[in-house]
């Protein structure tokens, strides 16, 4: 838009621009100064960044129209990790992996202690597990539904996880958080025998006779993200 002569304004809820590139991706995968350099180029092109402003809460789209803004492009991404809908999923020490990454990148969380279990075999699961290692976790175990060779993260990320000392447990689905005094003390799993049905759709099947329990004080789940609209579109 700036290159075509417009003067776009980016409203950012966080204290700095960059979105998931700055707050969701670990520095060992994408250095923050690279993103900051790209943002500086955008500023030179005439893009204005207004940080610490949550549209829908601090200012509405209707109010922005009154201020003279004529067009709106919503690019909030899939920034919510949702909830872990199993018994004990709201215990202390259990949180979405993407929220954990945000805390680390914004320097709200610098260290971890005790044993950590990461749920999810995708790229975010790999990022979260490797970040947990760097935050000082005693041990990190990663569990996923898929078979070892079918993990969505791929061979490269899986190998990087194992080089970092992460133990991969493929073919397991979580059933319950073990809670002691309101805090996470472990996670129970059952064997996953199949992830997709004959039509290729997600329809996991399990063998309830095969189970195991992982001890941990922190459980980080990375099982999909969704849009968190909040009050963004109120009045539109």
Language-model regions, residue ranges each:
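Short loop/helix-cap segments at secondary-structure boundaries that form the rim of catalytic
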Residues: 83-89
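A Rossmann-like FAD-binding core segment of flavoenzymes
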Residues: 33-83, 95-105, 109-112, 134-235
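Glycine-rich FAD pyrophosphate-binding loop
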Residues: 3-22, 140-149
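Beta1/beta-strand and adjacent pyrophosphate-binding region of the FAD-binding site
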Residues: 111-122
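N-terminal Rossmann-like FAD-binding beta1-loop-alpha1 element of flavoenzymes
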Residues: 1-10, 124-133
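Short glycine-enriched, charge-decorated loop/helix-capping segments at active-site entrances
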Residues: 24-29
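Residue-level detector of alpha-helix initiation sites
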Residues: 16, 122-124
């Amino acid at each position: 838009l700036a290159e075509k002569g417009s003067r776009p304004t980016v409203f950012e809820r966080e204290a700095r621009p960059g979105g998931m590139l700055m707050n969701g991706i670990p520095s060992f995968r994408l250095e923050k100064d690279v993103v900051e350099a790209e943002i500086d180029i955008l500023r030179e092109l005439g893009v204005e960044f207004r940080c610490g402003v949550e549209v829908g809460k601090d200012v509405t789209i209707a109010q922005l129209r009154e201020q003279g803004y004529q067009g709106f492009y919503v690019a909030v991404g899939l920034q919510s990790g949702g909830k872990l809908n199993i018994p004990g999923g709201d215990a202390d020490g259990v949180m979405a992996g993407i929220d954990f990454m945000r805390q680390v990148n914004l320097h709200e969380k610098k260290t971890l202690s005790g044993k950590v279990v990461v749920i999810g075999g995708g790229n975010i699961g790999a990022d979260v597990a490797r970040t947990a290692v760097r935050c000082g976790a005693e041990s990190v175990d990663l569990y996923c539904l898929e078979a070892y060779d079918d993990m969505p993260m791929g061979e490269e990320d899986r190998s990087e996880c194992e080089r970092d000392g992460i133990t991969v447990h493929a073919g397991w689905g979580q059933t319950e958080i073990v809670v002691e005094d309101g805090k996470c003390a472990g996670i129970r799993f059952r064997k996953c025998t199949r992830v997709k049905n004959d039509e290729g759709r997600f329809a996991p099947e399990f063998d309830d006779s095969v189970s195991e329990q992982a001890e941990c004080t922190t459980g980080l789940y990375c099982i999909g993200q969704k849009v968190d609209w909040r009050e963004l579109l109120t009045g539109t």
